[in-house]
């Protein structure tokens, strides 16, 4: 039985034990508070045209995202009506969830060690940073996560994963994520 009172995620322990020291040496930080750390991970599934025809699709996306994240996901709604897409204001269009703390570290661990190796023809992720140390990536199918039962899903959703760090530069953020075993391709 897992003792949740004393549980520390594997990557969180690695950060405090080895990654902090490696980052301090690599970038010459004088203070531990200068070392970049993970702030949050935002997961988003846009159900798109599927939910315009059937509003239950957004609910399905929410349930799948809740299973993947281990935390309740929120249904996202359209901000304004767009007649060309048959979209109405406040119509459900997807789901999102923000992970912080231990759940964030657990998700990143599952992403890099379980989900990414299950992607067909996977050659690493493109290092797409925003200039301020935040990393964004997309996945074509959410079925690579072990929490999703392939037989029970009706649609294979694509999903966005945004990793927000306290890093000031992209080089610092890339180094931090590389220490967390993020498989970059270049």
UniProtKB/Swiss-Prot annotation:
Keywords: Ribonucleoprotein, Ribosomal protein, RNA-binding, rRNA-binding, tRNA-binding. One of its GO terms (biological process) is translation. It comes from the Bacteria. One of its GO terms (cellular component) is ribosome. InterPro entries: Ribosomal_uL5, Ribosomal_uL5_bac-type, Ribosomal_uL5_C, Ribosomal_uL5_CS, Ribosomal_uL5_dom_sf, Ribosomal_uL5_N. One of its GO terms (molecular function) is tRNA binding. PROSITE patterns: RIBOSOMAL_L5. Part of the 50S ribosomal subunit; part of the 5S rRNA/L5/L18/L25 subcomplex. Contacts the 5S rRNA and the P site tRNA. Forms a bridge to the 30S subunit in the 70S ribosome. Belongs to the universal ribosomal protein uL5 family. This is one of the proteins that bind and probably mediate the attachment of the 5S RNA into the large ribosomal subunit, where it forms part of the central protuberance. In the 70S ribosome it contacts protein S13 of the 30S subunit (bridge B1b), connecting the 2 subunits; this bridge is implicated in subunit movement. Contacts the P site tRNA; the 5S rRNA and some of its associated proteins might help stabilize positioning of ribosome-bound tRNAs. This is Large ribosomal subunit protein uL5.
């Amino acid at each position: 039985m897992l003792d949740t009172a004393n549980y520390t995620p594997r990557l969180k322990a690695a950060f405090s034990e080895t990654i902090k020291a490696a980052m301090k040496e690599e970038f010459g930080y004088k203070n531990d508070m200068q070392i970049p750390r993970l702030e949050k991970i935002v997961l988003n599934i846009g159900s798109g045209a599927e939910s315009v025809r059937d509003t239950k699709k957004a609910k399905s996306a929410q349930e799948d995202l809740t299973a993947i994240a281990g935390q309740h996901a929120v249904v996202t709604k359209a901000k304004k009506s767009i007649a060309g897409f048959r979209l109405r204001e406040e119509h459900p269009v997807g789901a999102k969830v923000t992970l912080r703390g231990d759940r964030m570290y657990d998700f990143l661990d599952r992403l890099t060690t379980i989900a990414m190796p299950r992607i067909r023809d996977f050659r690493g992720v493109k290092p797409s940073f925003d200039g301020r140390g935040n990393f964004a990536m997309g996945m074509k199918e959410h079925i690579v996560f072990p929490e999703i039962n392939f037989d029970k899903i009706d649609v294979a959703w694509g999903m966005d994963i945004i990793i927000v760090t306290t890093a000031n530069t992209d080089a610092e953020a890339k180094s931090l994520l590389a220490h967390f075993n993020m498989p970059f391709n270049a």
